[in-house]
Amino acid sequence: MRILFISDLHGQCSAVTALPKADLLIVGGDFTQFGSVEDVAAVLHSVHKRPDPCLAVLGNLDPETANALLDEQDMSLHLQQRQFGGRRLFGIGGANATPFNTPYEWGDDDMAAQLAASHSNAGPLDILVSHAPPRNSGADRIGNGSAVGSQTVADLVQRRLPPLVLCGHIHEAAGIYAFAGAIVVNPGPFGPQGHYACIDWPDGQNAPATWLAQCR
């Protein structure tokens, strides 16, 4: 199975149709830049021009109310476990608190309580999709070296041990990292160049082959 992962579009979606074909496209949030539900819908319209199915979470710059839109289009991973191609996926949208008072933020304690109440948050997991990276994973390092990821996401990785974690949010931390036995992938902002991660995960392999690329 081939998965493409993109994140942090911020309304720049012209390169989506230039991405190579895959079995599944996953979007890690920030469809918009402080946009409305209608703005999210406009980006999704571009995404749906592709032939491959799509699953997604929202980012902290998207309105939380757009979760209903993802649900309506049967593509939400937020606090839901889904299966695709024999792989089990779970997602967390939004992000832990920032200094910027962005639209879709949550406290780590609040998200931990939501996870505890989620009937889907149990059992084996292959892929965690979280807009916010795990704290101290490397994918959460800002320019001054501080780790600003979510401790709740880190705890979830350490508890459920997914082989693959897909995240975004911290633009300057684009890269592939190892954390708690997982491959953690932050492709950086999608942008006009179409930055993305490609994941090849054949049946029978415990871990995928993963690399970063751009389509323009």
PLM segments and residue spans:
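Short, structured coil segments at secondary-structure junctions
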Residues: 21, 50, 71-73, 85, ...
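Catalytic phosphate/metal-binding cores of nucleic-acid and nucleotide-processing enzymes, i.e., regions
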Residues: 3, 17, 38-41, 46-48, ...
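Active-site environment of divalent metal-dependent phosphoester hydrolases
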Residues: 10-14, 32-38, 60-67, 82, ...
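Conserved catalytic scaffold of divalent metal-dependent phosphoesterases
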Residues: 9-11, 62-152, 216
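Binuclear metal-dependent phosphoesterase catalytic core
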Residues: 83-85, 154-160, 173-216
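N-terminal active-site segment of His-dependent metallophosphoesterases
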Residues: 1-52, 120-124
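Active-site neighborhood of phospho(di)ester-bond hydrolases with catalytic His/Asp-centered motifs
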Residues: 5-7, 25-30, 54-60, 76-78, ...
